[in-house]
Amino acid sequence: MPNSLAGDQVPNPTLDAIGLVDWSLRNAGTSGSTPGLEEGGTDPWTFSQLKNTDQLKEVGTASKLHQVVSGFLKACGLLGSLYFFICSLDILSSAFQLLGSKMAGDIFKDNVVLSNPVAGLVIGVVVTVLVQSSSTSSSIVVSMVASKSLTVQASVPIIMGVNVGTSITSTLVSMAQSGDRDEFQRAFGGSAVHGIFNWLTVLVLLPLENATAALERLSELALGAASLQPGGQAPDILKALTRPFTHLIIQLDSSVVTSSITSNTTNSSLIKHWCGFRGETPQGSSEECDLSGSCTERNSSASPGEDRLLCHHLFAGSELTDLAVGFILLAGSLLVLCVCLVLIVKLLNSVLRGRIAQAVKTVINADFPFPFGWLSGYLAILVGAGLTFLLQSSSVFTAAIVPLMGVGVINLERAYPLFLGSNIGTTTTALLAALASPADTLLFAVQVALIHFFFNLAGILLWYLVPVLRLPIPLAKRFGDLTAQYRWVAIVYLLLTFLLLPLAAFGLSLAGGSVLAAVGGPLVGLVLLIILVNVLQRHRPSWLPRRLQSWAWLPLWLHSLEPWDRLVTGCCPFKAYSNSHMTSKVAHCYENPQVIASQQL
């Protein structure tokens, strides 16, 4: 099946694909079927299409042995692919740090810009995208607050931006499933729900925080009520498993990014070349490095004449610049990540079949019996928080959820609370890490971690507590429906959400608050007006003037993606899917709900 990012040659959705036009108003200049629902097919959001090739027949001893061996090999392959997938994410993060850390340091040094809330938000987003690590971005903020380079009030928008920027990883992972229309629809919608939740929370809490400083005051109250004592480090289970492999590829000096911000040392390399010393240390004890190179980081202060130990990784002693190594690691890690994702998806489709698939889906997506069904989502939040806490990485957890959504194991309604729990889990990890800070920076580190925690907790109260306000779910479905037919929309979404729109807002904020209000105010008002008109078109068209009851009076390119799709398809050498490919699916027994229901355990 071709991996296409161009538009599909199927009935094209208009703006109704994202909920902006009433489907009953088909005189708007375009026509099409309900987004996300194939002709004569099933809705990929509500029905998983895991393939079942099992035959209900008696098998002999040799066949049973073959099945056992095959199942064991598939399980080993799945675990191995998952391991290298996680390692590739770690190396990808290192690559982004090598490519963008110096730029991130330069951005953070402009204190005048950081005092602007909108600029602070954008800086948090861009820096987290550049370094691919919310932990690194948070540690930078903590260091700046502790060194008095940044006030706690100015750090709040940056923390919000860090929360938004970390959702790009799952979106990038979903792109690897663009070869299959239904899988990409579910995977991209699942990754988008995380980013939509973060952006909606920012849109509500940033103005509120700017007006009332609610999060800052709440964190101060929590600090006043607690008796803080420096604690131990947070558990590091996942790193303990992946470090033996990733440290053979690359090792970075994590202190260089922070030191480049709090001081003027900007010429140090992020790559760790020296891991320690042979012989006696200044304290009189000998020091040796193990094969992974994990030992005391004193390479920055070592003099050339000392007998130093070279680290054991591919780029130790290399004369390549950080930028060159970053590009090499970026290309290699992306290649390994895509290969591992393809293997994971194929193995999941092979393993999760028939009764096994139904049992797994039932357990993961099941609700408690009435009247306690509402507790299922909150249990999922706790599970997401706990697993993220154990993995020590929200990016790894969310990136692992996306392929499972693509193959239909986890539905969007269950993945949403898992993502919310992941947000909480990463803040509790940051809180434990803050408690391990030195005494002089303990209060600042804990307050920043508490602000991050209360921000995500407020987001859950806003967009999950009341079921009717769970807006990220329908919005994510609309995005998934749209990208399923126009794959280039996924790239546009990535560029707009994490790069172009933040940079545009950043540029306007540099010109001053009045310029930002003069330009951004009318644009925001226009967007809100369009949303209001489209909601009324869908539900109360009689309330609108006749001219506004449809968008037929506008040029086609203003209310339909079809002209844009023709432009992109003509300019880009992507092969589109054909109508026959999309509509030629045959309903097998494993795609029949009645047959599956009869095979339930």
UniProtKB/Swiss-Prot annotation:
Sequence intervals crossing the membrane: 76-96, 111-131, 188-208, 325-345, 370-390, 448-468, 488-508, 513-533
GO biological process annotation, one example: sodium ion transport
Membrane disposition: Multi-pass membrane protein
Chief location of this protein within or outside the cell: membrane
Function text: Involved in actively transporting phosphate into cells via Na(+) cotransport in the renal brush border membrane. The cotransport has a Na(+):Pi stoichiometry of 2:1 and is electroneutral.
Segments on the Cytoplasmic face: 1-75, 132-187, 346-369, 469-487, 534-601
Keyword Mitochondrion among record annotations: no
Keywords recorded for this protein, A-Z: Cell membrane, Disulfide bond, Glycoprotein, Ion transport, Membrane, Phosphoprotein, Sodium, Sodium transport, Symport, Transmembrane, Transmembrane helix, Transport
Protein family according to the UniProt entry: Belongs to the SLC34A transporter family.
Chain positions found as Phosphoserine: 4
Pfam families: Na_Pi_cotrans
Glycosylation site positions: 210, 264, 267, 299
UniProt subcellular location: Apical cell membrane
Summary of the tissues where the protein is detected: Highly expressed in the kidney. Not found in any of the other tested tissues.
NCBIfam families attached to this UniProt entry: 2a58, Na_Pi_symport
UniProt gene name: Slc34a3
Superkingdom field: Eukaryota
GO cellular component entries: apical plasma membrane; brush border; brush border membrane; vesicle
Name of the protein described by the UniProt record: Sodium-dependent phosphate transport protein 2C
Reaction catalysed by this enzyme: 2 Na(+)(out) + phosphate(out) = 2 Na(+)(in) + phosphate(in)
Extracellular-facing ranges: 97-110, 209-324, 391-447, 509-512
Molecular functions per Gene Ontology: sodium:phosphate symporter activity
Disulfide bonds: 275-311
